[in-house]
């Protein structure tokens, strides 16, 4: 029986090395600090208590650690990247808010302390709003003062985020259409060592334009107006700002990305460098407008629910598969019909792009028989089913198929440690949730890339990770999420946040 | 009453009749224009398109309209002078009209009935909305104010080659 080293002993001797005498000098292999700083105690999180994602939640908890985070540092900065300000550039309704929220979700998932600062939110909470506040150069004295005040508030909050809250990535969401505004931002933040990256969003595709304008008209800016009146008002605002729009060019000597027609084309200026910045670029290359939903379902049952054997479905499992297929297809049809009949212009536009289910729904399963066989009824309907190796369940290693009591008996010290940090703990020859999250990242990017409805049939462990990303959960919440067989989880997308709905699968019929 | 594009008629800037049957066999772009609009700089690109394809059978007609934000307040003479002086416009500018409402010009009533615009609405939403008509008199495309004239180059080229 090999000795089990404590954390401190392992750190002193270095991972994988022979045990050395404590008195030995100059051990350069040893890590000088623990891998995780300030772990937080686990608490239970129930799916039903939350139906809006946490992407706008605060990041100022000292002990905050993200699901996909590889390591932590005292300063909070990761990837040797220092601090970064992302500045969005573009006219109204060019998906700037969508971009800022998506980048926030993804980078937070990686562990970067990210926060978006939306001009529209500052305007919402202001008083005595002048009528020309939406102009980049307001005509009235009150308008000029108002816009300047909001800009100063935003700048001060961003500086506080960097300096007081150990923020690493701030996203500035406003028009920023003039060269002088961009130059000022670059100058202000360069002086304090913050790298500035501009992302210009351009929409010239009529279909995307229609949808974006419809979304914009649903904001508070246009409350009380009929749709016709709202469009006129929108065009008036656009008309006022259009003459001031200076598209980004090489001459400005700034780092920028042009994101055109929601990712159909991306132009990256050649002076962009740095691991984290390039990770953002890669993410943008995969980001697309979402029209469908993502659905999560467990697989059907087998006789022994055993990990070691790759079991087939039993009778109950086959029945579940049939019911699941009928329920999912019915739900998607229902939802699309509701879109066509909706009062919301966005929904009507989305509904008008309705397609045959065979081509607009895709089903992903894990590589194991139970998950794939649960999707057989979808295959019979002509719907594409793909086995994804990334959806392989968390590998339990030495504790495979053991009960909690058996784990306690056989691995008492490991069991105790696992309760302290269920997300990161790894049993012998097993994976941790963290390992699972890291290996699933390519799948997350692929989800961002598709605009179809997606149904994912998988083990609970993988569903937790996927849900955790889409709903911006913390790594404390993630291991405690519950996915039961009687529930279909539906996640809907909008530019500002994702929402979840739990649907009862009618298994008793 | 069934109307074809070529049955339409309007007044030119001098108040004289402009019959659309003279447009047969030509590709036509029709734009409601204004002198004090954020999109007014689109005149430059419209003129570039006109110069590039005029010899191949392409025509642009500009219809001044003061219905959106009071951005075309001048007289017909002032409008013509503005276009020529500021943008070197050589394509025809018609007499000022309404494009929406009970006084809407018959040309625009026809165009709006053929193609819906932004968000599916028939009404013209702002200055510099554009209709593209092929050489058979069919309204094939409608573009919002946001669409830059330079991005229409490909469409025009393919219609001219038919």
From Swiss-Prot, chain A:
The keyword Signal does not apply. Coiled coil: none annotated. One of its GO terms (cellular component) is cytosol. It is found in: Cytoplasm. Residues 292-466 are annotated as: Fructose-2,6-bisphosphatase. It catalyses: beta-D-fructose 2,6-bisphosphate + H2O = beta-D-fructose 6-phosphate + phosphate; beta-D-fructose 6-phosphate + ATP = beta-D-fructose 2,6-bisphosphate + ADP + H(+). It comes from the Eukaryota. One of its GO terms (molecular function) is 6-phosphofructo-2-kinase activity. The active site is at 173 (proton donor/acceptor). The record marks 298, 459 as: Transition state stabilizer. Its main location: cytoplasm. ATP binds at residues 90-98, 212-217, 415-418, 460-464. The modification Phosphoserine is found at residue 6. One of its GO terms (biological process) is regulation of glycolytic process. Keywords: ATP-binding, Cytoplasm, Hydrolase, Kinase, Multifunctional enzyme, Nucleotide-binding, Phosphoprotein, Transferase. Induction: Expression is under the control of the RFX1 transcription factor. Beta-D-fructose 6-phosphate binds at residue 237. InterPro entries: 6Pfruct_kin (IPR003094), 6Phosfructo_kin (IPR013079), His_Pase_superF_clade-1 (IPR013078), His_PPase_superfam (IPR029033), P-loop_NTPase (IPR027417). Homodimer. In the C-terminal section; belongs to the phosphoglycerate mutase family. Synthesis and degradation of fructose 2,6-bisphosphate. Present with 3380 molecules/cell in log phase SD medium. This is Putative 6-phosphofructo-2-kinase/fructose-2,6-bisphosphatase YLR345W. It comes from Saccharomyces cerevisiae (strain ATCC 204508 / S288c).
Curated annotation (Swiss-Prot), chain B:
It is a peripheral membrane protein. It catalyses: a hydroperoxide + [thioredoxin]-dithiol = an alcohol + [thioredoxin]-disulfide + H2O. Changing residue 37 to A: Prevents oxidation of the protein. Its EC number is 1.11.1.24. GO terms for molecular function: glutathione peroxidase activity; phospholipid-hydroperoxide glutathione peroxidase activity; thioredoxin-dependent peroxiredoxin activity. GO terms for biological process: cellular response to oxidative stress. Glutathione peroxidase-like protein that protects cells from phospholipid hydroperoxides and nonphospholipid peroxides during oxidative stress. Plays an important role in the oxidative stress-induced response in the presence of Ca(2+). Has peroxidase activity using preferentially thioredoxin as a reducing power. The redox state of the mitochondrial GPX2 is regulated by TRX1 and TRX2 (cytoplasmic thioredoxin), and by TRX3 (mitochondrial matrix thioredoxin). Involved in sporulation. Monomer. This is Glutathione peroxidase-like peroxiredoxin 2. It comes from Saccharomyces cerevisiae (strain ATCC 204508 / S288c).
């Amino acid at each position: 029986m090999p000795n089990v080293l404590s954390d401190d002993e392992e750190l002193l001797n270095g991972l994988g090395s022979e045990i050395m005498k404590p008195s030995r000098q100059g051990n350069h292999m040893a890590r000088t600090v623990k891998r995780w700083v300030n772990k937080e105690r686990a608490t239970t999180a129930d799916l039903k208590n939350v139906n809006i994602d946490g992407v706008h939640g605060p990041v100022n908890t000292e002990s905050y650690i993200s699901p996909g985070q590889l390591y932590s540092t005292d300063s909070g900065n990761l990837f040797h990247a220092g601090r970064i300000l992302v500045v969005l550039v573009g006219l109204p309704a060019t998906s700037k808010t969508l971009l800022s929220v998506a980048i926030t979700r993804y980078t937070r998932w990686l562990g970067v302390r990210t926060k978006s600062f939306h001009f529209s939110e500052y305007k919402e909470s202001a008083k005595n709003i002048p009528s020309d506040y939406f102009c980049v150069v307001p005509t009235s004295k009150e308008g000029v003062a108002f816009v300047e005040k909001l800009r100063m508030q935003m700048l001060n909050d961003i500086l506080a985020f960097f300096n007081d809250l150990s923020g690493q990535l701030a996203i500035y969401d406003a028009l920023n259409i003039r060269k002088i505004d961009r130059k000022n931002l670059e100058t202000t933040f360069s002086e304090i060592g913050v790298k500035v990256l501009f992302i210009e969003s351009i929409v010239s595709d009529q279909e995307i334009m229609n949808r974006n304008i419809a979304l914009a008209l649903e904001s508070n800016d246009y409350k009380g107006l009929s749709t016709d009146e709202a469009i006129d008002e929108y065009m008036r605002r656009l008309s006022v700002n259009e003459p001031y729009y200076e598209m980004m060019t090489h001459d400005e000597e700034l780092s920028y990305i042009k994101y055109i027609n929601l990712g159909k084309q991306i132009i990256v200026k050649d002076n962009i460098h740095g691991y984290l910045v390039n990770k953002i670029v890669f993410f943008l290359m995969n980001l697309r407008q979402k029209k469908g939903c993502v659905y999560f379902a467990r697989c059907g049952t087998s006789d022994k629910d055993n990990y070691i054997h790759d079991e087939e479905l039993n009778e109950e499992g086959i029945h579940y598969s049939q019911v699941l297929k009928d329920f999912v297809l019915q739900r998607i049809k229902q939802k699309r019909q509701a879109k066509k009949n909706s009062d919301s212009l966005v929904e009507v536009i989305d509904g008008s792009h309705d397609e045959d289910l065979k081509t607009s729904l895709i089903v992903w399963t894990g590589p194991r028989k139970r998950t794939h066989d649960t999707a057989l009824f979808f295959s019979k309907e002509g719907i594409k089913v793909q086995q994804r190796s990334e959806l392989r369940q968390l590998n339990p290693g030495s504790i495979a198929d053991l009960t909690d009591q058996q784990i306690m008996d056989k691995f008492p010290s490991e069991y105790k440690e696992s309760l302290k940090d269920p997300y990161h703990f790894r049993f012998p020859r097993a994976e941790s949730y963290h390992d699972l999250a890291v290996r699933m990242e390519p799948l997350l990017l692929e989800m961002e890339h598709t605009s179809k409805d997606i149904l994912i049939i998988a083990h609970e462990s993988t569903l937790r990770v996927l849900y955790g990303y889409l709903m911006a959960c913390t790594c404390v919440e993630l291991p405690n999420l519950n996915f039961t067989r009687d529930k279909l989880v539906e996640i809907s997308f909008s530019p500002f946040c994702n929402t979840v709905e739990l649907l009862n699968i009618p298994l008793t019929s | 009453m069934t109307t074809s594009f070529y049955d339409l008629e309007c007044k030119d800037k001098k108040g004289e009749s402009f019959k659309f049957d003279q447009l047969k066999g030509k590709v036509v772009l029709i734009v409601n224009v204004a002198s004090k609009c954020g999109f007014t700089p689109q005149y430059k690109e419209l003129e570039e398109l006109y110069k590039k394809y005029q010899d191949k059978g392409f025509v642009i007609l500009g219809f001044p309209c003061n219905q959106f934000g009071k951005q075309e307040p001048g007289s017909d003479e002032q409008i013509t002078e503005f276009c020529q002086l500021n943008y070197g416009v050589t394509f025809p500018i018609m007499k000022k009209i309404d494009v929406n409402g009970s006084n809407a010009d018959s040309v625009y009533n026809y165009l709006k009935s053929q193609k819906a615009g932004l968000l599916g609405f028939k009404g013209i939403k702002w200055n510099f909305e554009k209709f593209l008509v092929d050489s058979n008199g069919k309204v094939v495309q409608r573009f919002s104010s946001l669409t830059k004239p330079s991005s229409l180059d490909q469409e025009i080229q393919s219609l001219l080659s038919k």
